[in-house]
C-alpha cells in the first residue's frame, strides 16, 4: 500500500452495501474550522482525487454524494491529507454556502456544556 492512499481494507462496513467506508473530515481551508464529517468509499475517493470537488458516500442512500449537486453548497478541495494509520481522510476545502444540511456553516453548531445543556452557537445561512 502506498503511504498516500487510504487503507479502505480498514474501513467500517456500510450498513446498506457492506463496502468499506472511511471517515472524511472537511475543514475550511482558510480558517481551519471543522465543517463536517462524512464517509468515503473507494469510488468517492477516486472522484475526489481526480477532480477538485468533494465527493462522499451517503450511508443512508447507499450511493455517491457529490457535495453541492442539489444544494449548490459545493466544496472545492484545496488539500487532502491521510492520517498516520491511513484510515481517516482530511479534506481542506473552500466551502460555498452551508456545509450542514440544516443550513449552518458547520455541522458542529451545537455546544454542549458539562451539565449537558445544549446551545446553538451560530445563525443559519440564508
UniProtKB/Swiss-Prot annotation:
Pfam families: PRA-CH
Superkingdom of origin: Bacteria
Gene Ontology terms: biological process: L-histidine biosynthetic process
Protein localization: Cytoplasm
Keywords: Amino-acid biosynthesis, Cytoplasm, Histidine biosynthesis, Hydrolase, Magnesium, Metal-binding, Zinc
Recorded metabolic or biological pathway in which this protein acts: Amino-acid biosynthesis; L-histidine biosynthesis; L-histidine from 5-phospho-alpha-D-ribose 1-diphosphate: step 3/9
GO CC annotation, single: cytoplasm
Top-tier EC class: hydrolase
Reaction it catalyzes: 1-(5-phospho-beta-D-ribosyl)-5'-AMP + H2O = 1-(5-phospho-beta-D-ribosyl)-5-[(5-phospho-beta-D-ribosylamino)methylideneamino]imidazole-4-carboxamide
Cofactor(s) in the UniProt record: Mg(2+); Zn(2+)
Record text on cofactor binding: Binds 1 Mg(2+) ion per subunit. Binds 1 zinc ion per subunit.
SUPFAM superfamilies found in the cross-reference section: HisI-like
Protein task: Catalyzes the hydrolysis of the adenine ring of phosphoribosyl-AMP.
Family designation: Belongs to the PRA-CH family.
Name recorded for this polypeptide: Phosphoribosyl-AMP cyclohydrolase
Protein's organism: Rhodopirellula baltica (strain DSM 10527 / NCIMB 13988 / SH1)
Gene behind this protein: hisI
